Each structure stands twice: as C-alpha cells, then as structure tokens.
C-alpha cells in the first residue's frame, strides 16, 4: 500500500506509540522525515534518532520521551497543517506561536526544515508543516 502523505503517517505513528507508552517507534525513512525528527529532538520532544537499514527498506527509529512517575508523554498533541491538497505558506510575520510559545510549529523553508522560532530569528517564512505541543 502506497503512502501519499509520509508526514501525516509519521505524526500518526508517533501519536499512537506515545498513547500506548512505547519506548520507540519506527518510520519509513526519507530526508524530510529525518529533518522533522531532528527539529523534534532539538526542541526536546523526542529522546533519540537512529537510522536502520539501507536503501528502500531503511527506517528511522525515534526514541520517545516521557515525564513523571506516571510516564506522561512529552508530546501532548501533533497537528498536520499544510496538507498535499491544501498547502499553507506563511511569511515571517505570519508564522504562528503555538500555545503562546510553549509549542512549536515546524516550517519547511528555503534554508531547510526548522522550528518557527529559528525561522523568525533568520527572518524567513515557508510552508507550515505541523504543530507540536
């Protein structure tokens, strides 16, 4: 079965794994998925990133983070914003602040995939891929 939207698939896999309190989840690898995972790690939402396999069967394994004695997921919610049927682009001033700055918007810019904070610092806009908080 082909996957038409790998970013939505990634967000769904992370959401499902964190709800079931799994320690990790695997996702089919691509450069975009790896870039998004690196932003999530930099922002403190996931613990680690490991690449497994080569070529067509390569996968990215993400270590999920939990907090507290009851293991509450660090990621409370993930929302896809720009979809294949409706792309959403914002300039620097139009980039949203997710939950008043507590969350992060992941933006695909001409200088790569980055958080909304980094895009604002560099003064560039781009395609808003998703919100994470």
UniProtKB/Swiss-Prot annotation:
Gene Ontology biological process terms from the UniProt entry: translation
SUPFAM superfamilies noted in UniProt: Ribosomal protein S8
Family annotation (PROSITE patterns): RIBOSOMAL_S8
Database matches in Pfam families: Ribosomal_S8 (PF00410)
Molecular function terms, GO-annotated: rRNA binding; structural constituent of ribosome
Keywords: Ribonucleoprotein, Ribosomal protein, RNA-binding, rRNA-binding
GO cellular component, one term: ribonucleoprotein complex
Task of the protein: One of the primary rRNA binding proteins, it binds directly to 16S rRNA central domain where it helps coordinate assembly of the platform of the 30S subunit.
Family from the record: Belongs to the universal ribosomal protein uS8 family.
Assembly with partners or alone: Part of the 30S ribosomal subunit. Contacts proteins S5 and S12.
Protein name: Small ribosomal subunit protein uS8
Gene source species: Prochlorococcus marinus (strain MIT 9515)
Gene for this chain: rpsH
């Amino acid at each position: 079965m082909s996957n038409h939207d790998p970013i939505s698939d990634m967000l769904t896999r992370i959401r499902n794994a964190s709800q079931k309190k799994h320690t990790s989840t695997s996702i089919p690898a691509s450069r975009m998925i790896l870039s998004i995972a690196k932003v999530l790690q930099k922002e403190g939402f996931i613990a680690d990133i490991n690449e497994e396999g080569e070529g067509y069967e390569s996968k990215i394994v993400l270590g999920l983070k939990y907090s507290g004695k009851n293991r509450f997921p660090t990621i409370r919610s993930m929302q896809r914003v720009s979809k294949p049927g409706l792309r959403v682009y914002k300039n620097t001033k139009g980039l949203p602040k997710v939950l008043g700055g507590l969350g992060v918007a992941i933006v695909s810019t001409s200088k790569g995939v980055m958080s909304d904070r980094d895009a604002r610092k560099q003064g560039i806009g781009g395609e808003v891929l998703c919100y994470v908080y």
